Design a protein with these regions (language model features):
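Glycine-rich cofactor phosphate-binding loops and adjacent beta1-alpha1 units
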Residues: 156, 200-278
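C-terminal hydrophobic helical "lid"/dimerization subdomain
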Residues: 196, 243-247, 286, 290-339
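Glycine-rich beta-strand-centered segment in the early N-terminal region that forms part
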Residues: 20-34, 47-93, 132-134
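NAD(P)H dinucleotide-binding glycine-rich loop of Rossmann-like/cofactor-binding domains
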Residues: 89-167
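N-terminal Rossmann-fold cofactor-binding loop
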Residues: 192-194, 235, 283
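Mid-domain Rossmann-like dinucleotide-binding core that forms the NAD(H)/NADP(H) cofactor-binding site
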Residues: 135-215
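Local beta-strand N-terminus motif with an aromatic residue
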Residues: 78, 161, 207, 228-230, ...
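N-terminal glycine-rich cofactor-binding segment
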Residues: 3-21, 38-67, 82-83, 100-114
Length: 339
């Protein structure tokens, strides 16, 4: 089989590898589609502190089960599945309180263990979630990105009365917009970014108001409209955002931080306790695959609005470079396998 392998930072090859055999409790998936994420680019460029090399990247992938290991029901052969990349121990404190996404021995497919940019992948059977026949392949491969939004909203518990402010109109910000509007019916969703084309994508995903904070002050604009956000989500991950969010937030608001930054954030603690703000963080997903599959079945979200480009996996270098360089026109890039 062919696999996309990062041998070391900035060295990507398509390598011939032996076809894997599923062990006990595992299934082998014949990959049909995979999605490119920022973390794939970070591993390729050597900017992911968790990655080990060489590594088959890819943690957003969909395919068909073509072999099962010992202890797995043979009825699963032929199932269309989306794969949850989060593998946890099930016994540590985080796992015991429903947070396998921060398991003390966490393994993420495509980061700590070989992932889905390959013609075949072996994964734990419990991580391969069946996809209903009426959900198209292109939507099935988008389950994992939407689980990020499901995890964020699971933390923040949005209501229809919320006024939500999202920093960042990249893929993670846009899936969150769709969840807030389509699933939770939040009355007002505001999206802030510095790229007008991304803000247009946010509009298409349901944002009520978009704002380019590279051109004028967000604080002044909100004050002029008399808006105090009750839910603020940082999907841009810049160290300056947290303090601004604390300043802009309504009393009793919730703030959710996504992504990673190793840069320090300067905050004034009085602003948090004075308003009794709740600050959450969100990493990966905690058992959110069935949640998102249900959203798709009910037509509450539309992945089609985020997919802008599709490449055969042989052109993966071109696909990643487009994803990295064309933030104006490019949002979600898919790779095809086994077509």
């Amino acid at each position: 089989m062919k696999s996309v392998v990062i041998q070391q930072p900035n060295e990507l090859v398509i390598e011939e590898r032996q076809l894997p055999v599923p062990g006990a409790g595992d299934v082998r998936v014949s990959i049909k589609l995979a999605g490119i994420c920022g973390s794939d680019s970070h591993i390729y460029r050597g900017h992911n502190p968790f990655a080990k090399y060489p590594r088959v990247i890819g943690h957003e992938f969909f395919g068909v089960i073509d072999a099962v290991g010992e202890g797995v029901d043979s009825a699963r052969l032929g199932q269309r599945v989306s794969v949850d990349p989060v593998i946890s121990c099930g016994h540590c404190y985080p796992c015991s309180v429903g947070k396998p996404n921060v398991c003390t021995s966490l393994v993420v497919l495509g980061v700590h263990r070989d992932g889905g940019f390959s013609e075949y992948a072996v994964v734990p059977a419990q991580n391969a979630w069946p996809i209903p026949d009426d959900i198209p392949d292109k939507h099935a491969v988008m389950v994992e990105p939407f689980t990020i939004a499901a995890n964020v909203t699971g933390q923040a518990k949005p209501t229809e009365q919320d006024v939500a402010l999202i920093y960042g109109a990249g893929p993670m910000g846009l899936v969150t917009v769709q969840a807030l509007k389509g699933v939770y019916q939040v009355k007002q969703v505001i999206v802030v970014d510095r790229i007008d084309e991304r803000l247009a994508m946010a509009r298409r995903s349901g944002a009520d108001w978009v704002f380019n904070n590279g051109e004028q002050s967000l604080q002044a604009a909100l004050e002029e409209k008399g808006i105090k956000p009750t839910l603020i989500i940082d999907a841009a991950c810049h160290p300056s955002i947290l303090q601004e969010a604390i300043t802009l937030a309504s009393p009793a608001a919730r703030i959710v931080l996504m992504g990673f930054s190793n840069e320090p954030s300067q905050i004034v603690q009085q602003g948090i306790t004075g308003k009794e703000l709740a600050i959450f963080s969100s990493r990966l997903n905690a058992n959110k695959f069935p949640v998102v599959i249900d959203w798709l079945k009910r037509g509450l979200i539309d992945p089609e609005k985020l997919i802008t480009h599709t490449f055969d996996y042989h052109h993966v270098k071109d696909a990643i470079e487009l994803f990295e360089k064309d933030q104006r026109q490019c949002c979600k890039v898919l790779l095809t396998f086994g077509q």
